[in-house]
């Protein structure tokens, strides 16, 4: 009886939390989520510490992989048959939806990590049945193993699909490294349900369609871009055009690229909605174990071929959906269209009158023809005046369309790979493209010590040198490998005028450093970083530590012509916890904004901690404020920030919005002021544990060494030329 009463209880004596149960973030949701700084480490990676994918992929037989992929396109499998005997449309959709999750605001998303294999992306409604595409690729992934990442394979499959249907692509680069668990740093929205409409209580809209919450680039939870049926599922091509324009712009695409990508994506393949959408099983993450990671099982019919239900819309856009041609524009512009509903009940458009020979054939029986269809987004290309202008030009000049689409598609699938120096493989194009943020090769043959000596004698202060170097490097984003010190774009528009860069101070410092660079043959980019290093060495020496900050010459200087000002505006800092600065008050807490920047810089929580403590005592605060400068020895690289932060002789009192006073408990005397960013290193239990390490009497030297190592990591974050 007792055994029966205990049946169903956790059989593991220690009660480890392997599934259900509240996490710390559930109990205390306002706590800092430091987990975003510690993802994708060796504990989750099955590859050995010595494994370097970017070296391994160069051993790949590139031609053999493409040959195998080309053969796969027409090797239809009974368990998931190819439409018209060709998997091209499916593979393109898979690659598109991987790359298309990128957003320019924070560089996150995109196809560069193989994240489509994991939640939530693998289970988004917009990615229905892409699980089948990846399973079709498994034999190729299995064959080439460690030399070919899922991330590269998913994107390459889309590229080869186009080529197999007659399109000449612009090129392809390998080098995307796989992750091994879902990303924790990417914000996909706050809605609690898939496809929640814009009047949802947790809506990503606060007003008109341009009020889409930053940094999001999709109109609904679970979509890549827009709702194909119309805004909130209500057909209206002109309103949908607004959504298309906003979402594609947030992926750094202009109107011409948007029309080209829409047309190129819909020239081939079809939508699937020939059935009852209510009879589709759960997505992969919700499916039972016997489904083996697959989802969306059709519970009402055989669910493949002509009976497939995916988006709910049904039909092909063109007459020949497995052939690259200019049929999309002829179909769209040469016909009048009327609203109808698919068998699954989705809104779509069909031609009012069409010749039978212009109708696409059935995916299984070529003797049967079906009506073509257009989504509301396709109709936006016809109805919106700006979009139609490009559509008509493309219709009249197919070669021009091919060129624009080839470049836009290449941009789409490489946007998150960073500069051209990261490209690998025989098909990587040589041309410099402005969206790659090109940087000329730098000089390594100058006398580094001579440059450092001139900087030391220049009269620049420690804070001026360190702050300028930091500002130059802090723009780096590990999400899409943009920004950083290489190129010295801090001296160019728009960065030279950013409030966070203190333009007046910056102009003064650059005036000195540019002269030194010209005299010595060093690049301005190298000279800026060297100045920061000189400042740190001086501050360390003043504190009794004789150190040399590591330095690798070779940074180049970009020109204004190499710089897309509009695109770089997205890199402007709105805050910088490292320099204790907020452009204005935001709904997001300052410490959360610091955490976001830290993650983009690729830093760990201990590295963030030691950098904050060092930057404070070096006097690098924006505008020279004294918040968080817990020392009487400003300009010396000491651990005073941590010593005084953890000293119980002091009490911390709020005196305003994001402002605190540090008072002597006995006398009541105010010793220092602080912000939330400062105090979080004493209040958060994890960060306090790091702060205590650096406050210890025996860790003064460790503090200096760790600060220098973290500093060097930031300065070299964009040095993809270094081993």
Swiss-Prot record:
Fetch the CDD domains from UniProt.
catalase_peroxidase_1, catalase_peroxidase_2
Q: Where is this cross-link: Tryptophyl-tyrosyl-methioninium (Trp-Tyr) (with M-251)?
A: 96-225
Catalyzed reactions per annotation: H2O2 + AH2 = A + 2 H2O; 2 H2O2 = O2 + 2 H2O
Which biological processes are named by the entry's GO terms?
Answer: cellular response to hydrogen peroxide; hydrogen peroxide catabolic process
Site residues (Transition state stabilizer), renumbered to this chain: 93
Annotated keywords: Heme, Hydrogen peroxide, Iron, Metal-binding, Oxidoreductase, Peroxidase
- Mention one GO molecular function: heme binding
Q: Name one GO cellular component term.
A: cytosol
Per the UniProt entry, the Enzyme Commission number(s) are: 1.11.1.21
Q: Which residues participate in heme b binding?
A: 266
The cofactor binding remark recorded in the entry reads: Binds 1 heme b (iron(II)-protoporphyrin IX) group per dimer.
Q: Name the InterPro entries for this protein.
A: Catalase_peroxidase, Haem_peroxidase, Haem_peroxidase_sf, Peroxidases_AS
Q: What class of enzyme is it?
A: oxidoreductase
Cofactors, names only: heme b
PTM notes: Formation of the three residue Trp-Tyr-Met cross-link is important for the catalase, but not the peroxidase activity of the enzyme.
A Pfam family it matches: peroxidase
* Chain positions of cross-link Tryptophyl-tyrosyl-methioninium (Tyr-Met) (with W-96): 225-251
- What residues form the catalytic site here? 97
Subunit-structure text? Homodimer or homotetramer.
Q: Which family does it belong to?
A: Belongs to the peroxidase family. Peroxidase/catalase subfamily.
Which NCBIfam families has this protein been placed in?
Answer: cat_per_HPI, PRK15061.1
- What does this protein do, in the record's words? Bifunctional enzyme with both catalase and broad-spectrum peroxidase activity.
- Tell me which HAMAP family the record gives: Catal_peroxid
Write down what this protein is called: Catalase-peroxidase
């Amino acid at each position: 009886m007792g055994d029966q009463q205990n049946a169903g209880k956790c059989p593991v004596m220690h009660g480890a939390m392997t599934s259900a149960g509240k996490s710390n973030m559930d109990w205390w949701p306002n706590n800092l989520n430091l987990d975003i700084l510690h993802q994708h480490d060796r504990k989750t990676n099955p590859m050995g510490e010595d494994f370097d994918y970017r070296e391994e992929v160069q051993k790949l037989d590139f031609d053999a992989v493409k040959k195998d992929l080309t053969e796969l396109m027409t090797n239809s499998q009974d368990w998931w048959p190819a439409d018209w005997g060709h998997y091209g449309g499916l593979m393109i959709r898979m690659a598109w939806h991987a790359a298309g999750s990128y957003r320019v605001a924070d560089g996150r998303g995109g196809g560069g990590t193989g994240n489509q294999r994991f939640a939530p992306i693998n289970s988004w409604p917009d990615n229905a049945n892409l699980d089948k595409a990846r399973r079709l690729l498994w034999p190729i992934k299995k064959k080439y193993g460690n030399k070919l990442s899922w991330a590269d394979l998913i994107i390459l499959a889309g590229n080869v699909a186009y080529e197999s249907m007659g399109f000449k692509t612009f090129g392809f680069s390998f080098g995307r490294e796989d992750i091994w668990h879902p990303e924790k740093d990417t914000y996909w929205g706050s809605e609690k349900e898939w496809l929640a409409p814009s009047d949802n209580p947790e809506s990503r809209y606060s007003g008109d369609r341009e009020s889409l919450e930053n940094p999001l680039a999709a109109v609904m939870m679970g979509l890549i871009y827009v709702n194909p049926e119309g805004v909130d599922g209500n057909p209206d091509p002109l309103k949908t055009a607004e959504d298309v324009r906003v979402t594609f712009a947030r992926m750094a695409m202009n109107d011409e690229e948007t029309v080209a990508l829409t047309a190129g994506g819909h020239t081939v393949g079809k939508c699937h909605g020939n059935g009852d959408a209510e009879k589709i099983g759960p997505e992969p993450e919700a499916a039972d174990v016997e489904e083996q990671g697959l989802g969306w099982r059709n519970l009402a019919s055989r669910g493949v071929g002509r009976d497939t239900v995916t988006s709910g819309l049904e039909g092909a856009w063109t007459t020949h959906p497995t052939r690259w041609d200019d049929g999309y524009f002829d179909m769209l512009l040469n016909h009048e269209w009327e609203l109808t509903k698919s068998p699954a009940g989705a809104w779509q458009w069909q031609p009012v009158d069409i010749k039978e020979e212009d109708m696409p054939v059935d995916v299984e029986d070529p003797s049967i023809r079906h009506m073509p269809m257009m989504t509301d987004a396709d109709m936006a290309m016809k109805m919106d005046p700006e979009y139609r202008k490009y559509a008509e030009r493309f219709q009249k000049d197919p070669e021009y369309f091919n060129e624009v689409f080839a470049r836009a598609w290449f941009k789409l699938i490489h946007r998150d790979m960073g500069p051209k120096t990261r490209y690998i493989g025989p098909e990587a194009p040589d041309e410099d493209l402005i969206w790659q943020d090109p940087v000329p090769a730098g000089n390594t043959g100058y006398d580094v010590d001579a440059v450092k000596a001139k900087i030391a004698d220049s009269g620049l202060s420690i804070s001026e040198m360190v702050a300028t170097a930091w500002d130059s490097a802090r723009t780096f984003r590990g999400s899409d490998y943009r920004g950083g010190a290489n190129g010295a774009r801090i001296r160019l528009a728009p960065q030279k005028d950013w409030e966070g860069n203190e333009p007046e101070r910056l102009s003064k410092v650059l005036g000195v450093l540019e002269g030194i660079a010209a005299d010595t043959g060093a690049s301005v980019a190298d000279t800026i970083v060297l100045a920061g290093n000189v400042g740190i060495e001086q501050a360390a020496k003043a504190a009794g530590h004789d150190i040399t900050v590591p330095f690798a010459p070779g940074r180049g200087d970009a020109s204004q012509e190499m710089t897309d000002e509009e695109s770089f505006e997205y890199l402007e800092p709105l805050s910088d916890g490292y320099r204790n600065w907020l452009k204005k008050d935001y709904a997001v807490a300052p410490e959360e904004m610091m955490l976001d920047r830290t993650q983009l810089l690729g830093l760990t929580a201990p590295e963030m901690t030691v950098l904050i403590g060092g930057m404070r005592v070096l006097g690098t605060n924006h505008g020279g404020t004294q918040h968080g400068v817990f020392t009487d020895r400003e300009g010396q690289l000491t651990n005073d920030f941590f010593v005084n932060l953890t000293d119980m002789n002091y009490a911390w009192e709020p005196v305003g919005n994001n402002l605190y006073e540090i008072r002597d408990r006995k006398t009541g005397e105010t010793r220092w002021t602080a912000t939330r960013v400062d105090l979080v290193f004493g209040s958060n239990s994890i960060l306090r544990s790091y702060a205590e390490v650096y406050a210890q009497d025996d860790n003064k030297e460790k503090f200096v060494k760790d600060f220098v190592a973290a500093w060097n990591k930031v300065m070299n974050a964009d040095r993809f030329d270094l081993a």
